[in-house]
Amino acid sequence: MAGHTEENAQLLSTEQESVSRHSSDSAASTASTTSLVFDRIGERVAANRSEKSMMVTPKFPPRGEMAYADDEHTQIHLDEEEEKDYDLEDSAFLTNGATNKSVDKKLRKLIWIVGGVFIGAWVLALFIFLGKQAYKHSSEIPHDPQATSSRGNGKKVTMDQVMGGQWRATKHSISWIAGANGEDGLLLEQGSAGKDYLIVEDVRTQNPETVGTLDRMTLMKDGSFTVAGRSLYPSKVYPSKDLKKVLVATDVQSNWRHSFYAKYWIFDVESQTAEPLDPVDLDGRVQLASWSPKSDAIVFTRDNNMYLRKLSSPTVIQITTDGGPEFFYGVPDWVYEEEVFAGASATWWDDSGKYIAFLRTNESEVPEYPIQYFVSRPSGKEPLPGEENYPEVREIKYPKAGAPNPTVDLLFYDIFKAEVFEVTIAGGFEPKNLLITEVVWAGSTGKALIRETNRESDILRVVLVDVVAREGKTVRYTDINKLDGGWFEVSEDTRYIPADPANGRPHDGYIDTIIHENYDHLGYFTPMDNPEPILLTSGNWEVVQAPSAVDLKNNLVYFVSTKESPITRQVYSVKLDGTDMKAITDTSNEGYYGASFSKGAGYVLLNYNGPGIPWQKVISTPSNGNQYTHTIEENKGLAEMAKKHDLPILIYQTVTIDGFELQVVERRPPHFNPKKKYPVLFYLYGGPGSQTVSKSFNVDFESYIASNLGYIVVTVDGRGTGFIGRKARTIIRGNIGHYEARDQIETAKIWASKKYVDASRMAIWGWSYGGFMTLKTLEEDAGETFSYGMAVAPVTDWRFYDSIYTERYMHTPQHNPGGYDNTSISNVEALSKNVRFLVMHGVADDNVHMQNTLTLLDKLDLAGVENYDVHVFPDSDHSIYFHNANRIVYDKLNNWLINAFNGEWLRTANAVPLQIDAAKV
């Protein structure tokens, strides 16, 4: 089987190389076809000579076989063979050797004349082709919705390039930092060539034509330092606000997706020396450490207990004492890290440096899930004698849907009184029905905003706490079931706006994302306890991770939105009274922008992510009197690479299903020929609020499939995905997978009806939620549209996934048992009607447990269903990287798909034993 695949790959490579000369331009097409005829004749002559001398049968593929590998060349190849079946031994095209004597001179003269005419026409067509610049790569041509052909004549995208990151745009992250005296436009640079190891620099000095207001300041001269005879090397650095000290993390060891353990040191900028964070415990595994806003103290968590180190003393103060395996202080447990904070911290300083808010998490009732490691020992511990041959098991407190959640409390610590206290607010959720999703201090006022939801995330409560008075009240309460029946997403974008009467802000307030007429928009709540916002944005579009920044001096709010299109991103500003909205980016040209603003919002790093070659530029914002612009990355190397390669043709369009307009991108192979029949691969993720179709530049595995293998790849963002309004998003609640699968199937039927699509060769693939959607689509479709599917790390029963994520979209299993039954992959009879499908999973997946795949396999076994393949990866988590596993995943997807579209799985389904003639043995 491997040899057969290898042979197909070699033939595919040879034929696509020839086909790269073909173009939709008529002149180019003439040139390419003519040269292809002569090339083929030349190849046959050479092959004939070689094969005759070796006395073997010629190895050209039988007629029609290569249709599976390269349809475009097959079309030309078959047409030529049907017109004339050349006998190579007696061919008039042989110009030397014995057969040349038998060729009639007149015939030979006629052949030379005809050949000369063909060559002359070929040269003329070539000049026309070059004159029209038809050789330009499609990446240089704006996206054309009506485009049917690439004009490239370059190399194919390779798997090695994609896997090696060669198509990844170079991006520079700027760590904006506020100056000790409030200066704006300062950035932190670590490890830049030709500079001290850690410096603070005015961004304007990056452009040699401008002068910054701050001289470069060195925080750490060298990339190493010594403490008690130890040589230490920084992994992470955190300067104090006054820039006099640096908190340095070394010996970092990963924990979960975001969290890690490290040893911490306090580095003095003036003396360039360091001391341990805790002089008594130099080797303590610290989970989190953060500076006081006043630069005079550091709070940290070690072994799930909280501690305080004041710089005025080497003594460490222990804040909590009962932390351990079941109680967490200041750091989240697994599910809060993964699904709520998307980070490792549950500690918040107020601006005055007087108070610390922190989360206490009680996991005592949360069931454990065992993660087994058969090859490695992530704990770093040596096994006990006699247990060397047993796998290491890590027990994780993992609340599955309907199981007990961790209970959380928000506690406060008074620095000066050395006192921990809690503020109780009447009318709150029961502890088992409470999620605390955001904490925002109101500057130095001693007040904090706390965002809470119920367990199913459909009731929101915003609480305002006064820690000085130790009292609080509910300032907003929203039951979304009365609005659109959806859910509240976890958000940490609330921005506090301090009062400034002289600047038109008589009261303090905050900006938050709100639901307005079916879309996510920005609202400004002022005073803080006002439940009715000033509407800052409105319309049939949405804000994205907003606000991005607030310019308090000029009362401006900056944000990114989908105003121009659901699949693009532009940057805007709006005044705090909701007027004068302006674009910061050029909206006359489509673009997918990201933005990172300086601390005072006077400067912004613009990230242009597509559809063209990405670039980065630092500019001053419109309200900044000092106009500044500096390009820091153009990705010229990537641009040159794109010119030399045949990239897929991207066709953006929409489909309307059940009244919903959905975004689609079709990746066509270079040199697309609408007269041919192409196999089609659907790729999806499809998770709630996600987006896969966008105008960002991306050369990925799907690009490789289209460019190298010559298949069409289609992605549709169905119902449930983001940025097309809440009506389309929330319709899936309580029954995830149903509408999403329908949208994939109906879109696939549209493609199957196209003249250039081979409806018998359609496949679908996805990872994680996309793996679930792949199986759900195959189940719903039952072989009617899709013949093949490839699912990586799929959820197969939402009862097995974590509670906070799942119940947000499905309610609890106790509340919605029928919905959970419907969403599970259980109709194995329907799966048996597909030609074949593939499932892959990491054995040590702590996110989507291997339990999902194993229970599906059991259902298939019980029903006697065998039309599938399985590959598991020992010790790999959800990303599947352990011991070269990630490359194996994509190699497997690649080879499995080629075999599918070559018809191998049809032959496998009806296996016939090879008959051997005993007389010839």
Curated annotation (Swiss-Prot):
Its EC number is 3.4.14.5. Residues 1-109 are cytoplasmic. The keyword Hydrolase applies. It catalyses: Release of an N-terminal dipeptide, Xaa-Yaa-|-Zaa-, from a polypeptide, preferentially when Yaa is Pro, provided Zaa is neither Pro nor hydroxyproline. The keyword Protease applies. Residues 131-921 are vacuolar. The chain crosses the membrane at residues 110-130. Residues 1-33 are annotated as: Disordered. InterPro entries: AB_hydrolase_fold (IPR029058), Peptidase_S9_cat (IPR001375), Peptidase_S9B_N (IPR002469), Serine_Prot_S9B/DPPIV (IPR050278). It is a single-pass type II membrane protein. Belongs to the peptidase S9B family. It is found in: Vacuole membrane. The active site is at 768 (charge relay system), 845 (charge relay system), 878 (charge relay system). This is Probable dipeptidyl-aminopeptidase B. Its main location: membrane. Residues 8-17 have a biased composition (Polar residues). It comes from Sclerotinia sclerotiorum (strain ATCC 18683 / 1980 / Ss-1).
